[in-house]
Amino acid sequence: MSHSFFNLFLISLFLYNNCIAHHYTFTVREVPYTKLCSTKAILTVNSQFPGPIIKVHKGDTIYVNVQNRASENITMHWHGVEQPRNPWSDGPEYITQCPIRPGSDFLYKVIFSIEDTTVWWHAHSSWTRATVHGLIFVYPRPPQILPFPKADHEVPIILGEWWKRDVREVVEEFVRTGGAPNVSDALTINGHPGFLYPCSKSDTFHLTVEKGKTYRIRMVNAAMNLPLFFAIANHSLTVVSADGHYIKPIKATYITISPGETLDMLLHADQDPERTYYMAARAYQSGNIDFNNSTTIGILSYTSSCKAKTSSFSGYYPTLPFYNDTSAAFGFFTKIKCLFSGQVPVQISRRIITTVSINLRMCPQNSCEGPNGSRLAASMNNISFVTPSHVDILKAYYYHIKGVYGTRFPEFPPLIFNFTAENQPLFLETPRLATEVKVIEFGQVVELVIQGTSLVGGGLDHPMHLHGFSFYVVGVGFGNYNISEEDPSSRYNLYDPPYKNTMTVPRNGWIAIRFVADNPGVWFMHCHLDRHQTWGMNVVFIVKNGREPNQQILPPPDDLPPCYE
């Protein structure tokens, strides 16, 4: 065999191996699980809770055949995956697709592009993501290498919430009554509540490590409604990635992680191997609302330890910040910096300013269970988003179907007031119900300022997630954003801001983010506290096609779930 032919053979083999499409099958069905002394049926993927881990290399394309064998509708979202030109597989129900109905299938095409580390997948239909979720491990494509030392082992950690009741009943009740949803009964680590909860001595996550080894923790906060503090006793964590992108390493004794966020952390097993160490997670909650203030516990022990590997109260417990310690929560958030500097767009094409608020809607005879007999709601720029119920927005946009949505989402708050004042006029609390989107030209550099308000209860934190893009968090602040300032960039970090897809707006504060609208399609933005999403704290961005063929939405798949008008 000639050298030239052999080299051509090797090149062809390399290209073939790098173009193989990976196929997965996700079968969604109800499976009984017992926790906290009671048994209930939960939605699962492949009968697993949490769901299976997907492993890809940067730039891969995978196909996931979702088979709905459950009794309710389902969709899947690939959180943190930008899906270039492919909104058809993004997943939010009635935003980019109609649901996969019981007995039906849909083949998702998931296109990875700029994602480097850990992202995740979850259901995106009602509150089905409570148990339908899992991690996605992204690896560098050779010859690329990691910008931090390679760990000896990888550890998936999914933080979540557990209700003893059927989650469908929880949702149906608070939607029907207009009140707040019942808080969860437990927090979980990889689905395990931990031994502090009833009937959970054997339902505790246990991590065994070897002295001198390094472990890469790939973590997501999959909780429905709670930002969380997390720590491991006597062990520091080196945070190396956030939301699928590398960051400047942060050495931390605790981390704060909001629903939807992912973190990669290096854990060095460098403590006394004869001791037992506990990991713990509990809520960060700055607002005046009911919440689950319990603590979930996991166990870390060393392989050489002679101690029994069972739950006990004799080990070392971590120190976590107090539940309402805002300085601790945002002290961690603001340490996150992009590993590579100088990439944030300096000049912007468009500035959009929106408020995010909790609201009230009046009920006849004050018959609802919100404050003063009202119905709780939520809004962006005083519009409480109404999700379509028959045709999804992407289909309506692509096929020019009228009457599904409007295009009048305001670029500026419709009313200017002291957004963070202690006492607000009652008339400000009532939102407008509508399905309004914001249309953006391809290639525009968008600055989006999100301002929290103190309406109804004094304000809350809001982890805001944008589909289809990662964005630079160029500013974070407390109080009112100066909306009259012509050029606020002098107060921004335009050097190494974090590059994320989910960022928390502080209670009675604001964030400023920037992104380039170079991904045509229909893209959802919403609060990742699911009660707020259910109440309407959402908006849709439609990014128009560019001029070139590679700047236009891909054609729809043949097996897209049908809509029923």
UniProtKB/Swiss-Prot annotation:
Enzyme class: oxidoreductase
Biological process, per Gene Ontology: flavonoid biosynthetic process; lignin biosynthetic process; lignin catabolic process; proanthocyanidin biosynthetic process; response to copper ion
Record's function text: Lignin degradation and detoxification of lignin-derived products. Involved in lignin synthesis in seed coats, in seed coat permeability, in seed germination, and in root elongation. Required for the seed coat (testa) brown pigmentation by mediating the polymerization of proanthocyanidin (tannin) from its monomer precursor epicatechin. Slightly promotes seed dormancy.
Transmembrane segments: none
Subcellular location: Secreted, Extracellular space, Apoplast
Family note: Belongs to the multicopper oxidase family.
Known EC number: 1.10.3.2
Record note on cofactor: Binds 4 Cu cations per monomer.
Source organism phylogeny: Eukaryota, Viridiplantae, Streptophyta, Embryophyta, Tracheophyta
UniProt-annotated binding residues for Cu cation 3: H124, H467, H526
UniProt name for this protein: Laccase-15
Tissue-by-tissue expression: Mostly expressed in siliques, particularly in developing seeds. Also detected at low levels in stems, seedlings, and flowers.
GO molecular function terms attached to this record: copper ion binding; hydroquinone:oxygen oxidoreductase activity
Binding site for Cu cation 1: H77, H465
UniProt-annotated binding residues for Cu cation 4: H462, C527, H532, M537
Signal peptide annotation: 1-21
Catalytic activity: 4 hydroquinone + O2 = 4 benzosemiquinone + 2 H2O
Sequence positions that bind Cu cation 2: H79, H122, H528
